[in-house]
Amino acid sequence: ELADKIAAADGYVMVSPEYNHSMSPALAHLLNHFGSSLFSYKPSAIVTYSAGQWGGVRAAVGMRSFLSELGCLPVSAMIHIPKAHEVLAEDGHFLEPVDAEKWTSYFARTFTQLTWWASAAQNQRNAIDPHKLAPAFKKDPRKEIPPQETPNNSSLSFRTQ
């Protein structure tokens, strides 16, 4: 059932706390479990938060490369929420005296990019099935081995002193 929901989506909002300078292990496990076949050729937005002053920015850096490897390309604008416990209530509403208008404007840049890219990617997927263009993309990338070149020992030179 979850796989069907993931496959049906045109884009994703990936939300993670910063956990030891990385994304949540639960999110990483979920992404690894379903792999690139469900997330590929669809955009994502990265939202991170932390109790500290950096808002999960270190987790976001790792998430960007992780999502890119899945073919789930993140939009350039990211959302970082420092001291999340002072900004958001458990139900997701803004706490007082937080300036909700400023935060909403901050979120809008990311979500506008995600909406635009999701629409563009959906139109392109409907026009051309990307898996027909690149069937190798459905394979597990870890099983792809690059061609091995045998070095010609005679062309190697070392400086000795």
Whereabouts are the PLM-identified features?
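Helix-loop-strand module that forms the ligand-binding subsite of alpha/beta enzymes
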Residues: 1-74
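Glycine-rich phosphate/pyrophosphate-binding loop and the adjoining helix
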Residues: 75-161
